Design a protein with these regions (language model features):
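Activation segment signature within eukaryotic-like protein kinase domains
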Residues: 93-94
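Glycine-rich ATP phosphate-binding loop
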Residues: 5-26
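Conserved short submotifs of the Hanks-type protein kinase catalytic core
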Residues: 61-74, 78
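A conserved short helix/loop substructure at the end of the activation segment
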Residues: 228-240
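Conserved N-lobe beta3->alphaC-helix segment of eukaryotic protein kinase catalytic domains
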Residues: 22-45
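Activation-segment/catalytic-loop signature of the eukaryotic protein kinase fold
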Residues: 56
Length: 246
């Protein structure tokens, strides 16, 4: 983001290419806790659908995070290229995201910022697997109750906006929003004005508009409806979502 840049580097011995996130310490001032949190989370996890941290090192001016190189670009870019996904392709993407999120939740980690920009394709291939990135806002449950409002407006769950104590369910809400976008090309909640947007989200008011949703299966709509539940207790968890027929 604003205090880092990512470069491709090559291991001198093995010739393997990696991504190196170069963080300028001076620009990081006041945001150290965010970075420390991201590193702590990444060190704890190992899953094929999550970007992996290989090592860290620092100089007097910079900090370097060596990560697996993914070259397929953001899910967001492919959505913009395609307009929408077929149900088969969309369900394959969402299945991988859910597998990764289930793993995170089992590890006691809530991502809190799932969105198409943070979902990357491992390679440019059509059938490339998806990996989750950007753990800057993620939180380990052992760090105490979650009540901080954070995330990206269009993907935030109602309970987060109402400043209630919240948990893993916020990630499932975000998966619901992403699923919706994959199938029709636009978000379920939208307003130029953030206050109006938040009102829509808090009421969980959205439609499967005609004609955009006319050819989408009832199964897909049912899947999304179980994720975009206003009450987090009624919302699907990862296991339930993965068992859904869609």
């Amino acid at each position: 983001g604003s205090f880092s840049e990512v470069r491709v580097a090559q291991h001198r011995c093995t010739q393997r290419l990696v991504a190196v996130k170069c963080i300028h310490k001076r620009a990081l001032k006041g945001k150290e806790a965010l970075l420390e949190n991201e590193i702590a989370v990444l060190r704890k996890i190992d899953h094929e659908n999550i970007v992996s941290l290989e090592e860290t090192f620092e100089t007097t001016t910079n900090l370097y995070l060596v990560m697996t190189l993914v070259t397929g670009g953001e899910l967001l870019d492919r959505i913009l290229e395609r307009g929408t996904y077929t149900e088969k392709d969309a369900s394959r993407v969402i299945q991988q995201v859910l597998e990764a999120v289930r793993y995170l939740h089992q590890m006691g980690i809530v991502h809190r910022d799932l969105k198409p920009e943070n979902l990357l394709y491992e390679s440019p291939l059509e059938d490339s697997k998806i990996v989750i990135s950007d753990f800057g806002l993620s939180k380990m449950e052992e760090q105490g109750a979650l009540s901080t409002a954070c995330g990206t407006p269009a993907y935030v769950a109602p309970e987060l906006l109402q400043q209630k104590i919240y948990g893993k369910e916020v990630d499932l809400w975000a998966v619901g929003v992403i699923s919706y976008i994959l199938l029709c090309g636009y978000p379920p909640f939208y307003d130029e004005n953030d206050t109006q947007l938040y009102k829509q989200i808090v009421k969980a008011e959205y439609e499967f508009d005609s004609p955009y949703w006319d050819d989408i299966s009832d199964s897909a709509k049912d899947f999304i409806s179980h994720l975009l539940q206003k009450d987090p207790a009624e919302r699907y968890n990862c296991d339930e979502a993965l068992l859904h027929s869609w």
